[in-house]
Amino acid sequence: MGCASELTTIDERKLILKGSQKFKPKLFKYFGSEKPYTGETINYFESGKKESAGPFHNGRKNGIWTYWHEPVIRKINVGRIESKGLYKFGMRKGFWTYWYPNGEKKEEGNFKLQERVGRWTYFNEKGEVIQTREF
């Protein structure tokens, strides 16, 4: 009465961090098709404002992507960029910058295989350096 199960090995470096959880990236496909999508995309918040924009190649994020802060009632951050950086084969790579909703720089540094590498610089909401850290 045993249960046979197969174990699948997953390279954690290829997982995408969203919040405090990691997910396996999925291929982005044409609606109603099994063909992976290649081309530019723009995603929108329910308000109609841009949420993210960037290119896909063979179903994976590939190229410079920009993310915007979600608009708020007071409209202090409408249209303000939240982060911008490079994807290669669906994984963050190279230099990335993040901003506070007020438009000041929050942090910047490099990624390799979805992991922070090298020197990262962190800023307060006034744009002043508060910490540097090596990864």
Where does each model-flagged region fall?
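Glycine/tyrosine- and acidic-biased, solvent-exposed loop/turn segments at the edges of beta-strands
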Residues: 2-135
